[in-house]
Amino acid sequence: KTGDIIKKTHPDVKVIYTRTTDTYLTLHERAEIANRNNADLFISIHINALDGIHTARGFQSYTLGRGETTGDKGLKMNADVAKRENSVIFLESNYKTVYANLNGNAPELDIMGEIIADQNRERSVYLSRLMQQEVCKATGRQNGGSHQNNLAVLRLTKMPAILLELGFISTPDEENYMNTEDGHTKYPMGFYNAFIRYKEKYDNS
């Protein structure tokens, strides 16, 4: 829905989807679509889940980085997030070649082989924070914060990139909201409002 709104209100913006069906694409393929089309921005939309935990809540966004939480507990939290998001790598037959520089299952992660461009990092973080503001305002969902972590699909892209976690499907009330017409309307509106604020800031830079 967000793409449709953007197309109608800003015909100058070309919206490219990595997929429009439930057909599985590897993380590498998703990033490659963006890179091949020289995209100015990459947004990956996900639904969160925690096994055996039914109380976790919140809309979250991620940009590429080492993870801002420190200490032994913090390192484990950072690693757990990266492992959840990167775990699909191991479903790919050639993952050892494609992701040679990314260990998605290590307890301590060597996150960045190269430091991403300052401009991309700055823009990614800015959009991440806008998403937190606008999506939570539109939906009334709990603000889970803007975070940094070693997520493969972000590392593989060559432009400002963010990953969004709409909520926890493992928490009944969050799952219920994501399946309502209200959720289907207000999440896209929040995405759109954040995108427009981002576009206004960086359109000609």
Model-derived features with residue positions:
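Active-site-proximal helix/loop segments of hydrolytic enzymes
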Residues: 1-205
